[in-house]
Amino acid sequence: MEKEQTKNQQENQKKSQKLQWHPAFCSALRLELLEDAANLEFTDEFQLTEKPLQIDCTVVKVKKNCRIKNEIGKIFRKHNIFEYKSPKDELNIDTFYKAVAYACLYKVLPNHVDEIPAEEITITLIRDRKPVKLMQELEKSGYECKKETVGIYYVSGVMFPVQIIASSELDVDMHVQLKALTNHLEESLMRQYLLRVSAFSEREKNLADVVLQAVSYTHLRA
């Protein structure tokens, strides 16, 4: 009986942590791409099927040929799928194939054949630490993982363009929103984050609050 209760408590704790981090990521992503917000449409937990099968976040370019200023959007096509892993979750080979499967489902979701062309879909996998083991396994499987810029790695040979983002490696001045999604937040980074938030509008500050709540919750439980 005690073992069962302990198991349930652990499952509830994992669920609670996920509920904290994923809304924080979606909010951080909006702030990260704030400069390009007029050209993008965001959907959190995009529902793929009637049963619970969700993409963490989708980002759709309003104008197909618009240029995204933020470097994480360099890879963007029309439809862009994000799969996020919290600091305590592993970004592994199964995550990779799940994201590819989700992209395939997303492609066939509309009512008309080829309404969303495969070449208009990209996948972004993101976690705070570089998933070294995953990238090694991808290389062994015949894919090529190439560093595009600091913290951003492109995976070639996949049916969709794929990038892996290690948010802890990103440039702090350019990507403080995503770098804040960590369970090891340094004081200097927190100060820089709060300084950036102070210049936000009320709506943007509400998004930042979601990020801060997740980070604060994690540090209080550490």
Describe each region flagged by the PLM.
Residues 1-221:
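Elongated, amphipathic alpha-helical interaction scaffolds
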